[in-house]
Structures are given as C-alpha cells and as structure tokens.
Design a protein with these regions (language model features):
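Long amphipathic alpha-helix in the N-terminal Rossmann-like dinucleotide-binding domain
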Residues: 51-61, 117-118, 127
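An N-terminal boundary/leader segment
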Residues: 1-54, 276, 280, 286-289, ...
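Short glycine/serine-rich loop/turn segments
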Residues: 73-215, 267-269, 318-319, 405-422
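Residue-level signal for inorganic ion chemistry
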Residues: 31, 53, 106, 225, ...
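Immediate post-signal peptide segment of exported/extracytoplasmic ligand-binding proteins
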Residues: 60-76, 255-267
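Short alpha-helical scaffolding segments that buttress acidic/His motifs in well-ordered protein cores
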Residues: 27-31, 312-313, 359-367
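Structural helix-boundary/capping segments
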Residues: 37, 115, 166-171, 177-274, ...
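Serine-dependent amide/ester hydrolase catalytic core
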Residues: 14-18, 272, 305-306, 327-436, ...
Length: 504
C-alpha cells in the first residue's frame, strides 16, 4: 500500500530518509505532486520552486549514498514566506511594488533551514508587506483556509500556515510582527511558534516593524517545530543581524518532561474580553483543565496595562513601517511607473500604484505619527506603554512559568466578512502584547470548535529566552489533546485535502 506523504511529520520524514525507507528525491516529488493536486483549492504559494527542491533533494541523496551523516531535517519539504530572500526565487512581499524582484542573496533563517537539509518547495503567499490578518491584502491572489476554502487562513503568514494545514509541506517559515504566525496557525489548526525577539536572525527578511518582527516556524507537531528551532538557532549569533542572540540549545531535549508542579498563569480579564467567542473560550478552559490534570498549578495573574497593547502597537508598528518602506521609491528597484517627466513624479506615482490599500494606510498613519507636534504626544506614550506592559509580564513570570490564553478570539471568518480595518486589527487582540515585550508565544491546536467545527487553539507564552521550556508546555498540551486533532499527524491535514497526490 502506498504511503501518503502528508501522513508523516517532519521528524518521520527525516528519519525515513536517513534510514533509506525512501529518498529525498521521492519526498520532493511527493510534495510537488501534493502541491499540484491541492494548490488549486488552497492557493498557498506565490511561487513553486521544483528545480531548487529537486536539486536540494539530489544533494541529500548523494550524501547518503556516499555514507555521509545527514543533517537533522534532511529531505523535509519547506515553504518560505515571501518576505524572506532565497536566491533563485522572487521575493515579492505579495506586493506589486516588488512583483518582479529577484532575490540576490538568501536570508540567514532560510539558509539555516537549508543547511539542516530542508527542501525549498517555494514561496508562500502573505498579506502585502505583512500588513494584515487574513492574507486578503496580497496583490496577487487570496489564500484559502484548507478547513473551509470560503474562509481566510489568517495572516499575515496565511500561505505558510495553509501550506502545512493542506499537507503540501511538513514545515514552513513565517514572520510575526503582531501575531502573524500564531493567529494563522490557530485558524488553520497547526502549530505556530514566535520565538523570543532576537532568537532567530532577521537578516534577509524584508522589514515591517524592526523592533517587533520575529521569524518562526509552522509545523504539524510541537516536535517538528522544536526541530526547526534547532536548525534556526543552532549556529548561534548571526553577525549580519545586530539583534541576533546566541541562544543555541537542543529544543527537543526536555520536550516530553512532566509539567507536574509547574505554575500556569491564567488572566481572568482575557477570558471575558469582548469579541472572544464561546467556543474558543471553552476550548481554552479545557486546555487549562488538561494542564491541571497533568499536575500543573493554575495561578491567576494580572497584566494591568495590557489594554494599551493594541493602541501602542498601532503607533510603533506604522511608525517603523513608514521608515522601513521609504526605501521602495520606484527608482532603485521595484515597480517603476513609466512615462514620468522627473524623479519626483516617478517616485510618487510608483508608490501610489505599487502599494495596495492597507500598505498605504499603514504608511500614512506612520507618517502622521512621526510628524512634528504629533510624535511627542503619541510615540513617546506608546513607548511608555511598551515599558509598562513588559514590566507587567516580568512581574507575572515571577509567579508562574508560563501563561495560557487564546491565540485568536474566534475561528476563521469568511472572506469579506470583516471590511472595517479597525475591526480586523482586533484579530490580534491576544498576540500583539508578545511583540510589544518581545517574549515567545506558541499556538497549539485543540481540535475543532463546538459551534463552527473549525480549528481552535490555545496560546502559551513565556519569559524571554525560555523558549525551550515553552515548547515543553506546548508538548504537554498537545499530548492531552491527541485524540482530537493535535498529535495525530494524519488528522492535522484538513480532510478535504488529505491524501490528494503526494504518495511515496
């Protein structure tokens, strides 16, 4: 009986390639077949890279044939968010502004995954320049949620989440500025991890908010995400990124340790927040009960300044975005308006026609917030709020080891259902504060919601650079929900896509 590629985790694929059960080339071909069979329904990719994938697979197979030791993720198919440079592909940020831009170097995070043996299957769709929570702002096409193709996959890393949920790849990379890994992971029913700020190099990743952005992995299981973190951090500090920290540890070492006696924080106000749906609330309450059943102590904690997080984020984020996107001027590279009489017209018209509505909105807001007379009033206040929120978390972590909360206030919504940008911003209600303070957070699937029968998740957050401990708690939660969706790799692929193409 043929083995379905999407029934295997990244760990199982790497083990199978190392053991000779199948070749890396066979895995690459299976992933490409799955993409061909499923992509029409999910539209997770902006560019598929069969040549790069097969070349990488051939190198893995040649090394094995020569008796060389294989890297830990040898033969594992990987999707890469399209704001990360990879030589041999375009890096468009899902924007007309960079529609034809060819990567001239490879991002450190991508290179480290390739060095670990991953096969680059292509570039995943996203919200334009990572501005959004639904992947609807992509200039090229929408990405559909594999659990219901009339609903959004979340964003901005929607393509990365959907590619894993549809079983097209085993791992993917995303970036998280305000929840852009954890929220789509929640809506698509996969594991999504935002490490501590500085844990993963951002060199070669097109910047949105430089003090907020962090790269992280998506996978079907917590173990797969831990293996990806080993690859992303194993080489230590990246000299090309001044924020990069040397935090190389084996993220799998204590993954299955008991959490008995550990303390899990619960924020009562978060569970009563406006917009939190009953099915998500019930799922998170079940998660708390499961952790308690495994011996953890539930402790109420207070984060009194958290209600300022969204306001602070939408000052700091747009201000940094305005600065970062000023380089896209239509002169040096990117979209260039034709027929302009002078450089001023070329720059202004190229930006007017190259950027989409949300990208313009964020930059206009940033320009206003950085203007004379406004900067002192709002930007300083936002930075003060940032300090207070960080202090709140530090005080909480003096009492608990991790904090449990929702990852998203609701399950996946239908395309066009949320048209008001300010309402869309509330999709990141539970995730933004982690980018404000820089701590790690992970979205863990809890099965399907009672009302919508769509994926629901819980989020676990932890102190800075305690990411290995955070993964241990995530694995404990995953064990507790193994009979629903989480922990059963074959079931973590959306049923409408499972088994379509991709036989090994």
């Amino acid at each position: 009986m043929a083995l379905s590629f999407d029934s295997l985790t990244a760990a199982q694929i790497a083990a199978g390639v190392a053991a000779g059960d199948f070749t890396a080339t066979e895995v690459a071909q299976a992933s490409l077949a799955a993409i061909e069979a499923r992509e029409g329904g999910v539209q997770a990719f902006l560019q598929v890279a069969p040549e790069l994938a097969l070349e990488a697979a051939a190198r893995v197979d040649a090394d094995r044939a020569a008796g060389k030791s294989l890297p830990p993720l040898a033969g594992v198919p990987l999707a890469i968010k399209d704001n990360m440079n990879l030589v041999g592909t375009r890096t468009t940020c899902a924007s007309r502004m960079l529609g034809d831009y060819q990567s001239v170097y490879t991002a450190t995070c991508v290179q480290r995954m390739l060095d670990a043996g991953c096969l680059p299957m292509g570039k995943a769709n996203m919200d334009e320049f990572a501005f959004g929570s639904s992947t609807e702002s992509s200039a090229f096409h929408r990405t559909n949620n594999p659990w219901d193709t009339e609903r959004v996959p979340g964003g901005s890393s929607g393509g990365s989440a959907a590619a894993v949920a549809a079983g097209e790849v085993a791992l993917s990379l995303g970036s998280d500025t305000g929840g852009s890994i954890r929220q789509p992971a929640s809506l698509c029913g996969v594991v999504g991890f935002k490490p501590t700020y500085g844990a993963v190099s951002r060199y070669g990743v097109v910047a949105f908010g430089s003090s907020l952005d962090q790269v992280g992995p998506f996978g079907r299981t917590v173990e797969d995400v831990a293996l990806a973190m080993n690859a992303l951090t194993g080489a230590g500090h990246d000299p090309y990124d001044c924020t990069s920290q040397d935090c190389a540890v084996d993220f799998t070492e204590h993954l299955n340790d008991s959490i008995e006696g550990k303390r899990v924080g619960i924020i009562p106000a978060f569970m009563e927040a406006e917009g939190l749906t009953p099915e998500v609330k019930a799922a998170v309450q079940r998660a708390a009960q499961e952790l308690q059943n495994q011996g953890a102590e539930l402790v109420e904690v207070d984060l009194p300044h958290l209600d300022a997080a969204i306001a602070a984020y939408y000052v700091i984020g747009p201000a940094e975005a305005f600065s970062n996107l000023a380089r896209f001027d239509g002169i040096r590279y990117g979209y260039q308006e034709e027929g302009c009489a002078n450089l001023s017209d070329q720059s202004s018209l190229s930006r007017a026609h190259g950027f989409g509505a949300e990208a313009k909105r964020r930059q206009m807001l940033g320009a206003y917030l950085l203007s004379s007379g406004v900067y002192d009033k709002y930007y300083y206040a936002a930075q003060k709020a940032r300090t207070l929120i960080t202090q709140d978390y530090d005080a909480a972590y003096a009492k608990v080891d991790t904090i449990l909360m929702p990852a998203s206030p609701r399950t996946a919504f239908k395309f066009g259902e949320i048209s008001d940008p300010t309402q869309m911003y509330l999709s990141d209600l539970y995730t933004i504060s982690l980018n404000i303070c820089g701590n790690g957070g992970i979205s863990v699937p809890l099965g399907l919601g009672e009302d919508t029968q769509l994926p629901v998740s819980a989020q676990l957050v932890g102190p800075a650079f305690k990411d290995r401990q955070l993964l241990m708690f995530a694995r404990a939660l995953e064990r507790g929900f193994a009979d629903t969706v989480t922990g059963a790799p074959a079931l973590s692929v959306a049923p409408d896509f499972a088994g379509k193409g991709g036989e090994l």
